[in-house]
């Protein structure tokens, strides 16, 4: 009985200490954020470093530290931080995305693209890798690179249409409305029930110059090659 009581006390004390430690980390993180918002980046960085080293598995602490290094143009430190992390977890797509982003911000675009390709090469059959890396290219407005990555990812996907919406959005942003419409039509071929989604997404860009004409042309091309009732519905919507 006494042994059980002692064990309960020990477990309770350990749990309490752990809870206090977590609360302390949360408080420190909030303090660092306050410093950052106040423009005291050096003080914020010091706390972010402290937290990242105390909990090396915590991706939020790690990525926040990297972010503040980049915001201070401490690019070499960001690169070192990310490379060291890659050595520890070499299969993390996200790390290659972040490292490539640092190079891209430094105007070392070729090195950025090489780094993103290294990320994809971890597992070239993984659709997750293509989408993660493409997202970093998008964030950096490297649209052509993002398009290339997503199109390559389609080849390895059992359902290539999961890339169609991403591609359509990029095409629309770059005023390639015919290409955007073609991706939505591809989506509808495989998933006719998604016609309403296609309409909603198209409606976002149809006011763009030449968007209606290009979209109609794309839909008609699909009607000519594969007559499907949803395409007529879509065409009527665009008109």
What are these regions (language model features)?
Residues 27, 61, 95, 129, ...:
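TPR alpha-solenoid repeat register
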Residues 37-38, 71-72, 105, 139-140, ...:
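Register position in tetratricopeptide repeats
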Residues 50-51, 84-85, 118-119, 152-153, ...:
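Canonical positions in the second alpha-helix
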Residues 17-83, 91-94, 114:
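N-terminal leader/linker segments that initiate helical-solenoid repeat arrays
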Residues 22, 56, 90, 124, ...:
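Short coil turns that delineate tetratricopeptide repeat
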Residues 30, 64, 98, 132, ...:
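Canonical tetratricopeptide repeat
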């Amino acid at each position: 009985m006494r042994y059980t009581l002692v064990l309960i006390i020990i477990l309770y004390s350990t749990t309490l200490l752990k809870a206090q430690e977590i609360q302390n980390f949360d408080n420190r993180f909030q303090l660092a954020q306050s410093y950052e918002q106040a423009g005291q980046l050096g003080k914020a960085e010091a706390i972010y470093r402290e937290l990242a080293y105390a909990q090396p598995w915590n991706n939020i602490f790690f990525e926040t530290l990297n972010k503040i290094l980049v915001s201070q143009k401490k690019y070499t430190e960001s690169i070192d931080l990310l490379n060291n992390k890659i050595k520890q977890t070499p299969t993390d797509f996200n790390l290659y995305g972040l490292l490539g982003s640092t190079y891209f911000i430094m105007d070392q675009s070729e090195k950025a693209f090489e780094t993103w390709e290294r990320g994809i090469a971890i597992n070239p059959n993984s659709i997750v890798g293509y989408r993660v890396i493409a997202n970093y290219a998008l964030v950096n407005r490297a649209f052509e690179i993002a398009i290339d990555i997503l199109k390559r990812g389609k080849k390895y996907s059992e359902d290539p249409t999961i890339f169609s919406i991403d591609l359509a959005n990029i095409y629309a942003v770059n005023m390639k409305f015919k290409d955007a419409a073609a991706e939505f039509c591809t989506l509808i071929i495989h998933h006719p029930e998604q016609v309403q989604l296609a309409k909603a997404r198209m409606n976002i860009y149809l006011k763009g110059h030449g968007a209606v004409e290009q979209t109609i042309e794309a839909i008609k091309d699909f009607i000519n090659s594969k007559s499907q009732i949803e395409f007529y519905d879509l065409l009527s919507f665009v008109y």
